[in-house]
A protein has these predicted regions:
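Catalytic core of pol beta-like nucleotidyltransferases
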Residues: 1-23, 32-37, 47-112
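Glycine-rich beta-strand-to-loop/alpha-helix junction loops that act as flexible
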Residues: 27-29
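Short beta-strand->loop micro-motif that forms the acidic, two-metal-ion catalytic signature
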Residues: 42-46
Length: 112
């Protein structure tokens, strides 16, 4: 899991240079503790700066950072505004299920 936490921190640090990361949630196999060697890291990223940004542009930003950093394990992120998260919690089975066990990522990390 420490490798995953390092990858998440690197990813969020780079993303934070481009948008304000209000919240980040880890879900999927890493949150459940059932990951295997080939598992990716599933994140929900919440930022008010995603407002008005077309979804494909959000994904391009996420993918650009992923490939720039060559992070392993691979991070599969879902970029949402705070309002989109509220809607998804009601309408998306995947997000609603994830909310039952997700782990909020402490970002930005507290000072040492």
């Amino acid at each position: 899991m420490s490798e995953a936490l390092k990858a998440i921190e690197q990813f969020l640090e780079e993303l934070s240079k481009r948008v304000r990361v209000e919240k980040a949630y880890l879900f999927g196999s890493y949150a459940k503790g059932t990951q295997i060697k080939t598992s990716d890291i599933d994140l929900i990223i919440v930022s008010p700066d995603f407002r008005g940004m077309p979804y494909l542009k959000k994904l391009d930003l996420i993918n650009e950072i992923q490939w720039k950093l060559s992070i392993k394990p691979f991070i599969e992120a879902i970029p949402l505004t705070p309002e989109e998260l509220e809607v998804k919690l009601k309408e998306s089975v995947v997000i609603r299920d994830a909310s039952k066990y997700w782990i909020r990522v402490n970002w930005p990390p507290p000072p040492p």
